[in-house]
Structures are given as structure tokens and as C-alpha cells.
Amino acid sequence: GILSIASSLLGAKHVYSYDLDEVAVKSTKANRELNNLTGKITVSQNDLLKNVQQKANVIVSNILAEILLLLIDDAWDNLYDNGYFITSGIITSKHNLVEDKLKDKGFKIIETKTKDDWVSIVAQK
């Protein structure tokens, strides 16, 4: 949703936006129209990156750690070499769990930021 709009407005050539929630998909499509980004953002209802074959330079996700852990393998598979996986929505108590899974998969942790009880991680393939 908002991450795809922001990515496009910040210069991404094309954005593929996936969400499981039908309401979120409809909202993203409406916001895409409001921001005149129809040709720049493809919006689909999907369960994380399951069965997605599209490669990306950057994958951005703002979801809870438990769901993020399920996404890491597919994120690796869908990133080009040296691509970035930017995650947020991780509660501090789950930070090490997520970071360890990223490292185990082969990601290099580039940056970690914490604000209050929330963590974001930038990892590179």
C-alpha cells in the first residue's frame, strides 16, 4: 500500500505491490490512481511472495516478525544479487530472531534502526 506509493514517488521505475487483504489491495489501487501512478505500480492480491517470479532490486515489507520470518526465503529468491530487503514492523523482542534468520539465509545486515519498541532492518543479498 503506502510503501508502494512512496517507492514510486521516490523514483522506483516500476513497483509490484502485494497484499493478502482484499481491502488493502482496493485501497492501494485507489491511492495509485489519486497519485497518478497507474502505469508505475502493479497491485495484486497475494500471500506474501508465494508463486511470484518477478525479480527485484529492492523488496520492502512492514509486517510482524512472525510473518516476516515466512517471507525471508522468498525475498532471497526474488532479489537480484546485491539487492536490498528493507523490513520494518519488528518488535524489539523479536529483532534477534529476524536478524538471525536473515543471516542464516545469506543476507548481510547493512543497517538496523530502533524507535521505541520497533525495529527496522536493511539487509543485502
Regions flagged by a language model, labelled:
Residues 28, 64, 102:
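Residue-level signal for inorganic ion chemistry
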Residues 58-61:
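Hydrophobic beta-strand segment of the Class I
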Residues 107-125:
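Core SAM-dependent methyltransferase catalytic element
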Residues 1-48, 52:
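Conserved SAM/SAH cofactor-binding pocket of Class I
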Residues 14-15, 85-86, 109:
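A short hydrophobic/small-residue beta-strand
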Residues 69-84, 99:
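A short glycine-rich, Lys/Arg-flanked "PGG" loop and its adjoining helix->strand segment in the class I
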Residues 23-27, 67, 94:
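Conserved short alpha-helix immediately C-terminal to the canonical SAM/SAH-binding motif I
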Residues 87-92:
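Short strand-turn motif at the edge of the Rossmann-like AdoMet-binding core
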